[in-house]
Each structure stands twice: as structure tokens, then as C-alpha cells.
A protein has these predicted regions:
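A short helix->loop->beta-strand "cap" motif at the edges of active sites that frequently abuts
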Residues: 29, 84, 89-93, 218-222, ...
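Active-site neighborhood of divalent metal-dependent phosphoester bond hydrolases
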Residues: 81-82, 88-93, 98-124
Length: 269
């Protein structure tokens, strides 16, 4: 399994950066995980957008889904998608988003008179906590995490043997449920948005130190910090996580590729 970082910024983009977006690939299967501001342009630097099998959205905040709009326009109007000038079988990727997404998409794009743009361009399916699905050679599971709108951590594993596991924590405050869901992950990607915890009200984000603590409790093999601004010192963030997690820690960078190897101990006998 291979994960490519297309965008790792929080709600405001880094200079020349993009918000949340990751390619998850195994064998011939290609899934785009989140599609925030700037991600569609970054996707085109790495892959043919028409070759994406499915898009998975962790939650309905703009920095995680807004570039579905240019993606949908490309799928609808690009010359290659027209029978007269392009393919006779235009691409229509699956789109998996949380329950209620269809209505929200319609309200967002309906503001300029194209309320069904996204559901026509994509094969839209809504999911909830505890759901499982298969996309090509990948198997996905979803678990609710604490954030300001319904948000789900996503686990990717091989549908063939389940041996390689990548867990994406999405946007989340501190969560015992997230720790349990990520137990034993080969690669755990957690947000590290804030230098210090929110002081008032509901928690919806982690600090680098909290990400490290969660990774240790989840017995993860490797930790990648993401959803982190270029205004936050990378070496400091890494050191904060390393205070609590003894495994390898990396701060996500656009263009970085992470391989998730099959662990022999997890292969079926």
C-alpha cells in the first residue's frame, strides 16, 4: 500500500500548498482520501484524475471537500469526457461521504445554479460509523471521532489479506475511541493542528504531543503528523510527538510517499 500526500494544510493553505488530500493506492486500486482546497491541481501533478477509482471524504468541512467542485467540472466538461472528442466511456468515480453529504453538496453548489453537479459527476454513496466497504483491492472501515461536524477516521487495509493497515484519524479531538480504532496500525496519520489545546468548549483538534500519546496508546508502528501549518515549527512538532511516541515520527509534506509494508506476522497461516 502506498500513500502520497497531495495536501496537508489545515483550514488555511500553506504557501503554494493544499488542504487535506491523500492518494491511497494498492495494486491497481487508486483512492483519493479527502479533496480539500487546492487538492485537484496537486492530484493532476501525480495521477490522471480519470484513473481515480473512488474519492472518500472524512467530513464535510470545506478544507476536506471543496475541490470536489473543480474535480466535478472536469468530469463533466473536460474534452476527454465528451463522446465526440474523448472517451466513449467517460470516468465517473465513486464518491463516499458521510450521511447528509448529498444535501450539503446541493446547498453548496446550488448557490450558483448547479445543485446536482457533484452527484452527476460522481457515483455518490453516503456512509456512517461502523460501515465497511471494498474498493478494488482495498477494504475500508469508518469510526466516528470528536469534531465539530460528523467526522470519521478511516482505516485502509488489503482486501486480499488485510495485512497492511493504514489509519487516518481525520480531524479529531482527544479520543479513546480513535485509539481503539487505530490499534496496531502500521501507519497512523494524525492531525497536529494546534500548539496548545483549545481552551474553551468542545475539543476538535490535537496537538503534536497529544498525537504522540494517541499513537503510543494505539500501539502504532509509525506516526505521521498532518493537518499542520507551515507556520508551526516542524522540528518542534516532531519533538513534541516524540516525547510520547518511541516509534518513527514524520511531519507530512506535500509530495511525500509512505509505503505500508505487509507485516509477515499478520499474514494468514
Amino acid at each position: 500500500m502506498r500513500i502520497t500526500v497531495l495536501g496537508k494544510s489545515p483550514s488555511w493553505q500553506d504557501a503554494d500548498g493544499a488542504c487535506s488530500g491523500y492518494l491511497v493506492e494498492e495494486r491497481e486500486t487508486c483512492v483519493l482520501l479527502d479533496c480539500g482546497n487546492g487538492v485537484f491541481s496537486k492530484l493532476r501533478c501525480f495521477r490522471d484524475y480519470a484513473a481515480v477509482d473512488a474519492v472518500v471524504i472524512s467530513h464535510m468541512h470545506a478544507d476536506h471537500f471543496l475541490d470536489l467542485v473543480p474535480f466535478a467540472y472536469a468530469l463533466t466538461y473536460a474534452p476527454r469526457q465528451q463522446p465526440a472528442t474523448g472517451s466513449h466511456a467517460p470516468a465517473r468515480p465513486a464518491l463516499h461521504a458521510p450521511r447528509g453529504a448529498r444535501d450539503l453538496f446541493r446547498r453548496v453548489v446550488g448557490a450558483w445554479g448547479s445543485e446536482d453537479l457533484i452527484e452527476k459527476a460522481f457515483d455518490l454513496h453516503e456512509y456512517g460509523a461502523g460501515d465497511e466497504l471494498a474498493i478494488g483491492s482495498l477494504k475500508l472501515r469508518f469510526s466516528r471521532v470528536p469534531h465539530f461536524v460528523p467526522t470519521h477516521a478511516v482505516e485502509f487495509s488489503s482486501a486480499l489479506n488485510g495485512a497492511a493497515r493504514f489509519t487516518f484519524g481525520a480531524d479529531s479531538g482527544p479520543s479513546d475511541d480513535l485509539v481503539r480504532f487505530a490499534d496496531g496500525a502500521d501507519l497512523l496519520m494524525l492531525e497536529a493542528t494546534l500548539p496548545t489545546p483549545e481552551s474553551d468548549g468542545e475539543r476538535g483538534h490535537l496537538t503534536p504531543a497529544e498525537a504522540g500519546e494517541h499513537a503510543t496508546r494505539a500501539r502504532a508502528r509509525r506516526l505521521v503528523l498532518t493537518h499542520i501549518s507551515d507556520e508551526l515549527d516542524e522540528l518542534w512538532a516532531k519533538a513534541e510527538a516524540e516525547k510520547f511516541f518511541r516509534g518513527p515520527v514524520t511531519v507530512a509534506r506535500e509530495g511525500a510517499v509512505y509505503e505500508v509494508p505487509v507485516q509477515a506476522s499478520r499474514l494468514p497461516a
